[in-house]
């Protein structure tokens, strides 16, 4: 029986991951969070533990010889580095580039295995983009993520959303620092729907580019219903992006008081363009709750790593352990009773 430590184990994604593990008795699961809060589950071999991972020495309080799933970006890179120095494996779901970069630096020179982008986005979105980037004609990729507001998301996800609206990023074309929302794009998230506005944001892109490739990758964020995206676009034009980022916690608390509306779904579109700016192809994904999809992607990655050949030391990405078809097959298996999913590949328009 192997040890599996879930940092953030009682949160929105963590609680779903614990439930998915109910059919995997080969794991001794340690659900760790700042507040000890039991999650309803039939799994017998789960231990709930309260631990502030930000305090010094927290790494020594975790079980040894474990695979660690890192869900909160509050986890210090130093803790991750300490676990990797013990030749352990850490799976990370983070969507903030600066944090992911810090984890990659922490993995340097260790015998452990850090896998970034283990989730829905980044994760499945990474695999979709990497599949398109394998075409040598591809010069630019634009990846749009749309989150439905059919329910209130967990605190960590909501805080990330508001932070992302004010976190500058380096433009792939010019290299200069750009404020989110400065270069929006419109995406067809499904074939029979008008293009929807999406706002440019900072996002991790590890694993997308083929070895030696120089594909430019742009990331965008949208909300369903679309008028919410337009409201955020107005706020950004008024220069409120940085303010929203700095007050992400306060805005998250406020958002939890708002009514739930829109679709309870997650949609991703990855579009490939050649050097003339002509669309080559695109991939469209539609699924259910983002937290369900992220938990299932973690499960699929765990299964792939257990059944795979050699474990890769240092920092690598989900692309090093899964391909797109494996991920989709695993999602359908784990989420068979939750809701429909669809993936379409659209060739270059005539």
State where each predicted segment sits.
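N-terminal Rossmann-fold cofactor-binding loop
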Residues: 31-36
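Rossmann-fold NAD(P)-binding glycine/threonine-rich loop
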Residues: 94-113
